[in-house]
């Protein structure tokens, strides 16, 4: 009898499980509470960052600890109280950033090795806590996503600073990538245009013009080489082209100046005041540089600047919501993330 013994080749190698990749969305920050104490803690951290206030000399430190932190927190606490999410006992920025991370994670649910999280540069959840949490979950690669369409040393760069500050204390560091600014990305410009059209369609009036208001910064920072202003201009130029508007129908301004130095101009509040005095009666304001609504959009623009407009003769005013966690807003972030994850997936 002949016995045939089957010959088996080597067992096929199992494909290695994909490495876990952390995706960390980062926005500016928020106090933990809307009382004076909570705002003081937040402002101390924020205003002590040399990327934000570049001259951190003895005179600034005396002013910060002697005057600013003893007067400004009470005023800003009142502003936060006007917009505070009472149900969750947190700022809208925290609520929205969490929602952005959750919806981004849901849109990437078919990629089980991706772990999406979120953090604040100042305040909580801190970048340190969330980076350490991602590493503890086995993420050997980390994509940090600064939620700023336009780059500035005072925003995007300080996110990088903090990420490296955390990583340099780790023995086993994850590989790190950081998403670039997306100030002219088609998806971003399309999302802005869509959000403006959608919001205007809900209004009982037609604005005579639209103001595009960006967070300001000291003019001196631009003179030192910060590209922020040029990127804001590029965003508005692209938005004008997409919407078929000229520079008289879509204006570019800068808000939120602080201190006595000259900041980027034209100033939003002064422009809105002049428009009203010049006879503009119906106005809308969009804030393209903010990925999520926050104190600067919900209180400074939607309340303070609306009051300025009305007080000087304006009749109808509307602040257009930021992209937030809208479908278009999440699509912008998702495209940015997927592009930067190439080679890791």
Curated annotation (Swiss-Prot):
Listed Pfam families: Ferrochelatase
Residues given in the record as Fe cation binding sites: 215, 296
Catalytic activity: heme b + 2 H(+) = protoporphyrin IX + Fe(2+)
HAMAP family noted in UniProt: Ferrochelatase
InterPro entries: Ferrochelatase, Ferrochelatase_AS, Ferrochelatase_C, Ferrochelatase_N
GO CC aspect terms: cytoplasm
Similarity comment: family membership: Belongs to the ferrochelatase family.
Compartment(s) of residence: Cytoplasm
Documented EC number(s): 4.98.1.1
EC class name: lyase
Pathway: Porphyrin-containing compound metabolism; protoheme biosynthesis; protoheme from protoporphyrin-IX: step 1/1
A biological process term (GO) from this entry: heme biosynthetic process
Name of the protein this chain belongs to: Ferrochelatase
Biological source species: Rhodopseudomonas palustris (strain HaA2)
Gene Ontology MF annotations: ferrochelatase activity; metal ion binding
Keywords in alphabetical order: Cytoplasm, Heme biosynthesis, Iron, Lyase, Metal-binding, Porphyrin biosynthesis
Disulfide bond entries: none
Role noted for this protein: Catalyzes the ferrous insertion into protoporphyrin IX.
């Amino acid at each position: 009898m002949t016995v045939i013994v089957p010959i088996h080749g080597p067992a096929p190698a199992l494909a290695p499980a994909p490495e876990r990749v952390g995706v960390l969305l980062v926005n500016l920050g928020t106090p933990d509470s809307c009382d004076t104490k909570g705002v003081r803690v937040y402002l101390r951290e924020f205003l002590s960052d040399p990327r934000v206030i570049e001259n951190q000399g003895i005179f600034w430190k005396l002013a910060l600890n002697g005057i600013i932190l003893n007067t400004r927190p009470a005023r800003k606490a009142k502003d936060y109280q006007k917009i505070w999410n009472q149900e969750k006992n947190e700022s809208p920025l925290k609520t929205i950033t969490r929602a952005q991370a959750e919806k981004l994670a849901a849109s990437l649910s078919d990629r089980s090795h991706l772990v999406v999280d979120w953090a604040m540069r100042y305040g909580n959840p801190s970048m340190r806590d969330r980076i350490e949490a991602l590493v503890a979950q086995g993420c050997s690669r980390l994509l940090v996503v600064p939620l700023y369409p336009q780059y500035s040393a005072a925003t995007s760069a300080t996110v990088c600073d903090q990420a490296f500050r955390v990583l340099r204390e780790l023995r086993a560091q994850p590989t790190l990538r950081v998403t670039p600014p997306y100030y002219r990305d088609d998806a971003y410009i399309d999302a802005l245009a869509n959000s403006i059209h959608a919001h205007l369609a809900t209004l009982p009036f037609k604005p005579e013009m639209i103001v595009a208001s960006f967070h300001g910064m000291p003019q001196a920072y631009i003179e030192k080489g910060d590209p922020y202003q040029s990127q804001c201009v590029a965003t508005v130029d692209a938005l004008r082209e997409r919407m078929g508007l000229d520079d008289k129908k879509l204006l570019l301004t800068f808000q939120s100046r602080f201190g006595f130095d000259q900041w980027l101009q034209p100033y939003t509040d002064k422009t809105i005041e002049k428009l009203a005095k010049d006879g503009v009666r119906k106005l809308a304001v969009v804030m393209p540089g903010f990925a999520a609504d926050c104190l600067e959009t919900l209180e400074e623009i939607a309340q303070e600047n609306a009051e300025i407009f009305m007080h000087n003769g304006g009749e109808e005013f509307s602040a257009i919501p930021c992209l937030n966690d809208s479908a278009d807003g999440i699509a912008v972030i998702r495209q940015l993330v997927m592009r930067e994850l190439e080679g890791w997936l």
